[in-house]
């Protein structure tokens, strides 16, 4: 049974094309009836639209096997006035699903990935947090890779805000317990006996995905096709990573 990341794992961070072996891996899981759930920290496009873009790329993801933060956000905070910090696509999608941008009197601060954050943005987030507005990270990705650059991920930014203000933050997507539990419930629709210990999670993000999964007793597989390459593995916590592969084609070769 598998949890499988998307960016840097199934599709390239640079041109969004399927990574070597990605389509074949999904096809094999489908044909062999191996339970899986695609788990992504997508925060730019509505869930159904993003799933369709993946299918259009040749990833034959079956129904009931996809989860992103938008799928579970309503359980954490229902549509209301919020201060949205992130890419324009994130702000627009949040408004499309019923949330209202309000930086003067928000019920919560929501932070998503972006490569254009300024210190003025961080100052505003700090000021709101110090007024008692709760902080919600859309996920806890460690690094946001875009155009070949490695920007601080949402998890890193939320941790910085927490450190500077003393305010704690909650997380919607990976690696939060709530998100992984929701993914497990989807997996149980394929195999009612599924437990975390039965799952192998495949991702390119050791800190943002795999370390938290390991704490839940999942097996962890790091792929070097995204945020981390062979030259930057020195700082990995190898106690929390069971296997390292160049890309998902190596896992497909084992399964086929």
Question: Model regions: which residues?
Answer:
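Active-site donor-binding segments of glycosyltransferases and PAPS-dependent sulfotransferases
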Residues: 72-76
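Acidic-and-aromatic substrate-binding clefts and catalytic sites of carbohydrate-active enzymes
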Residues: 15-19, 45-46
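Asp-based, Mg2+/Mn2+-dependent phosphohydrolase catalytic module
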Residues: 2-6, 10-16, 23, 28, ...
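Structural recognition of the conserved hydrophobic beta-strand(s) that form the central parallel beta-sheet
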Residues: 37-39
